[in-house]
Every structure is written in C-alpha cells, then in structure tokens.
Amino acid sequence: MNIIQSGITAENSSIAIIIARFNEFINKNLLLGALDTLKRIGQVHEENILKIYVPGTYEIPTIASYIAKSGKYDAIIAIGTIIKGQTDHFKYIANDTSSSLSRISTQYFLPITLGILTTKNIEQSIERSGTKMGNKGSDAALAALEMINVMKKLKKVIYY
C-alpha cells in the first residue's frame, strides 16, 4: 500500500502570490503572513516568490490563469478581502472568484490556495488577518506548501 503525505518545506519551489489592492490595509497583513510562512516554515527563497498586484479580488483568476498556463510556478496563493455590503455584489464576486480559481487549479494541475477573506464586516476581516482568528494568508501559504509536496510525490508514483 502506498501512502502519500505532505511535507511543509519546499525550498526550491517557485510560488506566485496574487494580491488584490482593494482593501489593501487588510490584504497587506495577509501577505505578510503568507510571506513569513513561506520563508520561515517552507524555506522558500525570496527570489522564488513572485508578487503580483491586481485591482481587486475579481481580477485574481485572470492572472492566475496566465501564471498557470506558463508552467513556471509550483503553486499560486490568492490574497484578497471581500466584505459584505448592502447588495448581493459580495456573493457574486466571492462565488465567481472561488469557482474560477478552482477551475484553473484543476485544469492546469496546479495548487491554487485561497487567502481570500469573505467576511460580514471590517472587524471580522481584521481578526482573520493576524489578530484573534490567526492569519488566513499564512494558512493559505501552508496549504500551498503541503500541496506542492503532495503533487511532487504523486508525480513520482504516477509517472515514474
């Protein structure tokens, strides 16, 4: 019986982080959490991390698709914050972004992890970007590291 389990170091891996500028004061903390996890826990070298800024969360999938198609990266981390307002706009942005990233991930066999907050208010966003509720950017980076390792091990079992 073969069992594949993930590891968390990925020092020779290349990772792209796509960051939404909208709600930048929250996303900045998510990015810092992701970078800290990649470097300190994952041992990923600074020169192997590409940071790309886009206007908002809705624009992340377009860039993720472009990066995935290049085949140059081992994972993508999406960073953004969607805060519920008075209209249903929140739902559409969150659903479209999430489903698009999932589709890109499966289409290109590339881990894309979500450091995207979907919250009811600013307070919840602040709590999830490094205070009471941890840092979802850090969580997304950790998931990316684990998925990189699972994919590398799985390729050896399937293709070699």
Swiss-Prot record:
Stored Pfam families: DMRL_synthase (PF00885)
UniProt KW keywords: Riboflavin biosynthesis, Transferase
Disulfide bond positions: none
Catalytic residues (positions): 89
Binding site for 5-amino-6-(D-ribitylamino)uracil: 22, 57-59, 81-83, 114
This protein's record includes keyword Transferase: yes
Coiled coil segments of this chain: none
GO CC term (a single one): riboflavin synthase complex
GO terms for biological process, alphabetical: riboflavin biosynthetic process
GO molecular function terms noted in the UniProt entry: 6,7-dimethyl-8-ribityllumazine synthase activity
Reactions that this protein is recorded to catalyse: (2S)-2-hydroxy-3-oxobutyl phosphate + 5-amino-6-(D-ribitylamino)uracil = 6,7-dimethyl-8-(1-D-ribityl)lumazine + phosphate + 2 H2O + H(+)
Binding-site list for (2S)-2-hydroxy-3-oxobutyl phosphate: 86-87, 128
Pathway as given in its UniProt record: Cofactor biosynthesis; riboflavin biosynthesis; riboflavin from 2-hydroxy-3-oxobutyl phosphate and 5-amino-6-(D-ribitylamino)uracil: step 1/2
Broad class of enzyme this protein falls into: transferase
EC id: 2.5.1.78
Family affiliation: Belongs to the DMRL synthase family.
Description of how the protein assembles with itself and partners: Forms an icosahedral capsid composed of 60 subunits, arranged as a dodecamer of pentamers.
Reported function: Catalyzes the formation of 6,7-dimethyl-8-ribityllumazine by condensation of 5-amino-6-(D-ribitylamino)uracil with 3,4-dihydroxy-2-butanone 4-phosphate. This is the penultimate step in the biosynthesis of riboflavin.
Protein name according to UniProt: 6,7-dimethyl-8-ribityllumazine synthase
Gene behind the chain: ribH
